[in-house]
A protein has these predicted regions:
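Beta-strand elements within well-structured catalytic alpha/beta cores of enzymes
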Residues: 1, 18, 131-137
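Short, active-site-adjacent cap segments at secondary-structure transitions
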Residues: 24-26, 50-51, 141-143
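A mid-sequence, solvent-exposed acidic-amphipathic segment
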Residues: 103-133
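Phosphate-handling substructures
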Residues: 36-115
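Domain-level recognition of soluble alpha/beta enzyme cores
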Residues: 153-177
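Short aromatic-enriched loop/helix-cap "lid" or pocket-rim segments at secondary-structure transitions
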Residues: 29-30, 53-59, 147-148
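Active-site-proximal alpha-helix that buttresses catalytic centers in soluble enzyme cores
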Residues: 1-45, 109-110
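Active-site catalytic microenvironments for nucleophilic, acid-base chemistry
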Residues: 6-9, 31, 35, 122, ...
C-alpha cells in the first residue's frame, strides 16, 4: 500500500500495467493500482514470472556438488549461514545461464530469458510516447530485463539479480529508437 501511496503522491499515472501470474506479483500490482487515479487494468502475463530458483536448486545441486567440492561445503552450511545460501543461488543461477547447462526437465535460460524479453519488448511497443508503464514482477525478471537493455551477456545478469529488493522500483526510460 505504501508504494501505491507514494506513486499517487508523486502524481504517477500508468497507461498500462503488467504482472506475472504469481500471486505476490498480481496482489502487489493490484494493490498499487488501487491507490492510483484512473489506473489501467492489470494485464497478467506469465512471461513476467520469477526465475524458478527452487526447482533449479533441486535439479542442479547434485550436479554442482559432483563438479566442485567447494559447492558441497556451501550446501552443508546453507541452513545455518545465509551467505552460503546466497552463494548457492548465485552458483546455480550462473550455471543455469551458462552454455554448459543442458539439463532437461527444467525451464532453460533461453526459454526463460526469451519469454521475459518478448513480454518486455511487447510492453515497450505498446507504450505511447510520454507515458509510464508498470511491470510488477520479481528480481530475476528485472535483472533479465536490465541485462537485455544493457546488452549484457548472460553471465553478467546475476549482478543485477541479487541487489533487487522486494517492492523496489526500477525505472527504465526508453524511446522508440533506443
Amino acid at each position: 500500500d505504501l508504494t501505491g501511496e507514494f506513486l499517487r503522491h508523486m502524481g504517477t499515472r500508468f497507461s498500462a500495467a503488467y504482472s506475472g501470474d504469481l500471486s505476490r506479483q498480481r496482489e502487489t500490482g493490484q494493490r498499487v493500482l488501487d491507490q492510483l487515479e484512473d489506473a489501467p487494468d492489470l494485464v497478467i502475463d506469465p512471461r513476467f514470472n520469477e526465475v524458478q530458483t527452487d526447482e533449479q536448486i533441486d535439479v542442479m545441486m547434485p550436479i554442482l556438488i559432483g563438479r566442485d567440492p567447494r559447492f558441497a561445503d556451501l550446501v552443508a552450511a546453507m541452513n545455518t549461514d545465509t551467505k552460503s545460501f546466497q552463494k548457492i543461488i548465485e552458483t546455480v543461477f550462473n550455471y543455469w545461464v551458462s552454455h554448459e547447462c543442458d539439463i532437461g526437465g527444467i525451464q532453460s535460460w533461453a526459454d526463460y530469458s526469451g519469454g521475459v524479453v518478448s513480454a518486455f519488448e511487447g510492453a515497450m511497443a505498446s507504450a505511447k510516447s510520454g507515458t509510464d508503464t508498470a511491470i510488477f514482477t520479481s528480481g530475476g525478471t528485472i535483472a533479465t530485463m536490465v541485462g537485455h537493455v544493457l546488452r549484457l551477456t548472460s553471465d553478467r545478469v546475476y549482478e543485477f539479480y541479487e541487489p533487487v529488493f522486494n517492492c523496489s522500483i526500477t525505472r527504465i526510460i526508453f524511446n522508440s529508437r533506443k
